[in-house]
Every structure is written in C-alpha cells, then in structure tokens.
C-alpha cells in the first residue's frame, strides 16, 4: 500500500503539500495539484479516512450499529447501508451490539473517537444506550426498530401484523399462539397489536407469549392446554426454531399446527416445509436510511421517518382453505 511519503516523492513535492492538497486546508497551485493527483492515481494511494477526519473535523465515515448480525435480516440491512454509502463516497464502521449495553456503549464510543459524521442504528438494549447515542450530537437515523420520537426508516408493521393474522385465518385457525418481542419498540408493538386485533375481531382464541422465554416444553404445554393450531412468530429465525420443536414433538406442519414468520430471510425457502412469512424489504431499509443520513450530512434535506411496504409470501407452512 502506497504511503503519503511515496506520493510526495513521486510528485516531487513535500509531504505537507500533499497533505494540504488532499485535505483542502491550504493553498496549492493547480499545476502542483495535477502532479499530486497523477501520483495518487499512479500509486493507487488511499488516504486514511480517520487521519483526514482528525485534520478536517469531518469524515466520510458512518457508524452502523446493529443488534444481531447472526440474523440474516440484519446482514441484508448492512449490505444495503454499505452499498448506498459507497455509492455516495462514504465508508462504514460496523458494530454488532448483540443486545448488550456494554458492547453498544463501546461501539458508540468508537464511533466518536473515529469522528464518524453520523450514525445508523437499529434496536438498542436500554434507554441509557439511546441516551448515549443522542449524546454523540451527530445526525442519526434508526432502522426498523425505533423508540418513540426518533427519526426512523421502517417497514409497515401494522400491515405486516395484519397479513400474518389474515393468513392463518385463511387456514381456518381457531386457537393461536402469538409470539412477541420487546413491545417498547414501535415496530414490535405495531405488528403485535395489528395481529391481535384481527384475530380478536374474528373471535379466535389468542394466547400471547414473550418469544425469548418460549421453550420446547412450554410450547408443548400451550398446545396441550389451549389446543393451539396456529403460531405467529415475530421473525423467521424463531419460526424455524418453532418448526424444529414441532417436528421433535411429532406435530405436523401445517396439517396440525401452521406457522407464519416475519422477514423472509433467504433460508425461508430452504426449510422443510418452506416458510410462509411477511417479506420485509431489508436491503431497501438499509439503503433508505443511508440516503437520508447522507442527505442530512450534506445539507440537502432533514431526515423524515419513512415507511416501506411489506408483502406476504405464501409457502408450505400454512394451510389454505
């Protein structure tokens, strides 16, 4: 990798002159600029973004903090962020918060130290983590899992929850286990409330359960006690786990219990039976959030909350009447 000294030697100028030309913080004659540019191209020199940011008090770095990079949904989100950022001349510094406040705070501190111009984040584990995000005083856009009052790019979760409920009703659901995640987040609350409303209006029995506390033994108890014939999951990864448990319990999907997921991650077509699920535009969520953030950084427009449509993908894990 070429160094700034090699660029200076190639262009026959001082290192200080190369630095001024790159950072734009001093006068450099056009003829000299042309020589430096030719040297940069010839040597394929890549300026250090962090070093430049320290000189310019501004960077082309964006911090990206996601809650679970093992979930393919967030992998797609990250790809959308990265592709849009690179197309606009920015770089990404990524952190996997893993719903761990200590990790989240460490990544936020790293974004600050490295002079990130803005931050894109999804679910944070605690109110204190959100406070520290806002304390950076950098423009930020949240993806999918917002708290009240934050600028967010998310899918239409009211529509998503409605589609989940309508789909299992089409399969003649009579007793439903409705799984949910942290309802303090608007996205989880919206899809939960929407599904529950549709089911209750259809006079269907509904049992609710915090997803993270569900075990195979508890699932078996619910099925025996409430004659559960349909399960709504808040994401595809949980839906796969539920279907594995049902297989272990010798319960047929969808004949005895139908299962519907949320996200439509790539593995949804690889499982047997293939998973009926709500498709979230994960890649587009990442792109939209990045575009909004960069537009704000460049003074084009202030970010506004955006809602993207979802759709239902019917596969083999639900019944069709």
Regions found by a protein language model. Give the residues of each.
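N-terminal helix-turn-helix DNA-binding module of bacterial transcription factors
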Residues: 1-60, 76, 319
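Append "Primarily bacterial transcriptional regulators
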Residues: 7-8, 40, 184, 257, ...
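Flexible loop/turn connectors
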Residues: 221-321
């Amino acid at each position: 990798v070429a160094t700034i000294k090699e660029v200076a030697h190639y262009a026959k100028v001082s290192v200080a002159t190369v630095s001024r030309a790159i950072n734009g913080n001093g006068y450099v004659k056009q003829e000299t600029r042309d020589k430096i540019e030719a040297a940069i191209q010839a040597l394929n020199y890549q300026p250090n973004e962090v070093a430049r940011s320290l000189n310019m008090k501004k960077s082309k770095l964006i911090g990206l903090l996601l809650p679970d990079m093992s979930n393919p949904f967030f992998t797609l989100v990250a790809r959308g962020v990265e592709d849009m950022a690179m197309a606009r001349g920015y770089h990404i510094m990524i952190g996997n918060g893993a719903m761990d406040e200590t990790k989240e705070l460490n990544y936020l501190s790293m974004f600050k130290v490295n002079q990130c111009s803005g931050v894109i984040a999804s679910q944070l584990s605690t109110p204190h983590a959100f406070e520290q995000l806002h304390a950076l005083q950098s423009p930020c856009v949240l993806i999918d899992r917002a708290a009240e009052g934050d600028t967010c790019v998310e899918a239409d979760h009211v529509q998503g929850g409605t589609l989940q409920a309508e789909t299992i009703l089409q399969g003649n659901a009579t007793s439903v286990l409705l799984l949910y995640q942290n309802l303090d987040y608007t996205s989880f609350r919206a899809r939960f409330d929407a599904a529950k409303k549709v089911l209750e209006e259809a006079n269907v029995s509904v049992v609710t359960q915090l997803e993270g506390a569900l075990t195979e033994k508890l699932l078996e108890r619910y099925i025996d006690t409430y004659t559960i014939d349909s399960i709504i999951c808040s994401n595809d990864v949980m839906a796969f786990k539920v279907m594995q448990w049902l297989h272990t319990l010798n319960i047929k999907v969808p004949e005895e219990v139908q299962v519907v997921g949320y996200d439509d991650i790539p593995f949804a077509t690889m499982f047997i039976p293939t998973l009926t699920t709500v498709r979230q535009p994960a890649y587009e969520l990442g792109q939209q959030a990045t575009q909004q953030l960069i537009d704000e950084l460049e003074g084009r427009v202030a970010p506004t909350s955006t809602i993207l449509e979802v759709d239902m993908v019917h596969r083999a894990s639900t019944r069709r009447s």
